[in-house]
């Protein structure tokens, strides 16, 4: 009996040792279940309705029809407050301190029929007397505005409501900038990136008209998008209580904004890296100086570790950061050429029992060579210079994780076939709505928002504006594929060039030590089995 027991234990130990030593450990893979609107509603007739809307935007309430959910906004003739003022030479804008509330009252009507044929005159699925504001920094000056609206109940209190099947909340965003002629950059990244990034906002296409007296003005195709906030169904971290020893918070790196609570951290104060952190949670009314100071202290510790010249200190960064989230953030943003990420609209959150995590994803209008003031180079990586990442990439363990994660995702949600199919199917789903939006805004786009021409690395002038929606989609797909193909061949050698030789690969060292220990166990198990067999 004992001999059989020893033999069994020996075999089991041998198998475990073999698996752990010879099977390469891969980074943890997290997949979030996420449905795509264009797949859920693929049977909708996307060719209904006109393809042309005049530049003035006026549409007939009796004739307008769309297969997309339809929002009707009515502000009863009110003007949106201009919350920014300009300097005398109009070179800079600053927030007007006299305007404390950017919202105006609005009636928000949603029409979303089961047959996917939505008319302005149809019975509404939902009507709310809430409030609305214009969103954005530079984008607030675009002719096609982006909006944020808040749902209210009959007493003027915030009302949580599910819209288009998304998690209930009172705060919603209508976005899709005039600068994205494909209409799908945000949708693509939120859907695909949301597969691996928890709390990434869901977004659903819709069309929007503004009621102006007895007339209706067509505003275009929009994405109804969840906001990034601490809430159930959003960034669902624990509710922080003042006496809690561990902190829960949501912060955002961006430009300095004195109208919201800003943090003073070691790196921002010393200007070691770009950007400032604002606090999104706890709310301003709950953010005491003590809590604010504790958050600043935690972040300063992380920054001092990352930017330390003492490698024994630097190597402890994994004690503070959810490293896998930073790996995924690098891969997604480099793949989609979103070089605003890490600088602007970059969110981080911390649950009381967990490490600091980067995410969720937000704001991709300018990704994939869609930045007006600069030409993206598909044969280059720019994310290596972003705050914190410029230090993380000095660690060979982090570089190894990034490259292996990229290789893994290229076989699934970042494969050429997956992305191209996603784009084609989304374009088919948008159908005539995409042409309506283009006819409404393309003239304004050409007048002041088209992508500037630049010389590429070979000295050739590149014109990035296309004459048709089909050509725009082709450029979109080509841009994705060209950069991905370059990453396939060059990501590892490029990132390896940033690795510091004096950074000991503690991860590899640990795995090597573990391998030796387990190899010994494996050999001992063989000896035990042989002894049992020989009867000793």
Annotate each PLM feature.
Residues 4-27:
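Hydrophobic secretory-pathway targeting helix
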Residues 21-31, 81, 280-343, 349-522, ...:
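Middle-to-C-terminal accessory/interaction subdomains
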Residues 25-117, 502:
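N-terminal module-boundary/linker segments of secreted carbohydrate-active enzymes
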Residues 110, 116-176, 291-294:
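Conserved oxyanion/phosphate-binding beta-strand-loop segments in alpha/beta enzyme cores
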Residues 155-156, 169, 196-201, 216-328:
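Internal "kinase-insert"/substrate-recognition segments embedded within catalytic cores
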Residues 178-199:
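A conserved alpha-helical element in kinase catalytic cores
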Residues 195-208, 338:
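Short, well-structured beta-strand/strand-turn elements
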Residues 205-217:
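Beta-rich nucleic-acid/ligand-interaction surfaces
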